[in-house]
Regions:
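Domain-level signal for soluble alpha/beta catalytic cores
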Residues: 1-182
Length: 182
């Protein structure tokens, strides 16, 4: 059995266009890594990263443990391009930027996670073109739309719900169609 310790992106997580200081993020991640390693995890999983400043700080903190690191990237589509992002927001950084920012021999895999299902296949292709490491995916469980919809609010062009809106209308068959592309 392998026990993974999970670390998520630094606040403001839902706003990848707002960039925290590297030093603040590093302090936060060092504290989290210290707790996880003290408790005996075998692997560090970095989840929902949508900014390279967070990613660099988390990798620096996790690398000090010598444990394997899996990097999880969250992505959005905007004007036909895939960017690191969450809930319809991005800061202009790409998957290739994230892979370049992940320069540690402890990084053993990359995943696309917590991204719209209709974006995940294209994001995986970009990830595959950016790294030779193993890749994986798991998308959001909600909000699977091919076209913008207007259910309890206005949705953006990527089919994402505005912040605070529930993502509870997933059609399981449509989600499966997307997942088969992965």
């Amino acid at each position: 059995m392998v026990i993974a310790g999970s670390i998520s992106a630094f606040e403001p997580k839902g706003h990848p266009e707002i960039v925290p200081s590297y030093e603040d993020a590093l302090r936060d991640y060092e504290e989290q890594v210290k707790i996880l390693t003290r408790e005996g995890v075998d692997l560090i999983v970095l989840e929902m990263f949508a900014r390279t400043v967070d990613l660099k700080a988390a990798i620096t903190a996790a690398t000090e443990t010598s444990l394997p690191i899996w990097v999880g990237l969250s992505c959005e589509r905007h004007d036909g391009q895939i960017y690191l992002g969450l809930v319809g927001r991005h800061g202009g950084e790409t998957i290739a930027d994230a892979v370049r920012a992940s320069s540690s021999s402890n990084v053993k895999a990359f995943c696309i996670m917590h991204s719209p299902p209709q974006v995940t296949a294209d994001a995986l292709r970009e990830l595959q073109n950016s790294t030779s490491l193993p890749i994986g995916a798991y998308a959001h469980g909600g909000g699977v739309y091919d076209q913008p919809v207007n259910v309890r609010g206005v949705y953006d062009q990527g089919g994402q719900a505005p912040a605070g809106q529930p993502l509870d209308w997933t059609d399981p068959e449509r989600y499966l169609e997307y997942a088969r592309e992965w």
